[in-house]
């Protein structure tokens, strides 16, 4: 996932999460906001309950890989992927299926 497609500012995270349009699964929560500008962007949030810094960074790398395979950047959506602590207990393929099903509910799927 290229850096231009990432959400980085705290106020942008807050704005998207305040809209309260979300889809959840056992390992992650997907917050969505329709936007009328340029391209889609994605933000990833991993809490400290997931593990130490190394574990959290590994999870972020995995999510970025999954998003590249699953997410269509042609749609005009800002999304935030919030990772739950159960994410590390599941296999990569299972987590990818949960992410795909969340994006299918939003209808932003490749």
Predicted regions and their residues:
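Positively charged, solvent-exposed patches that mediate nucleic-acid binding
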Residues: 1-110
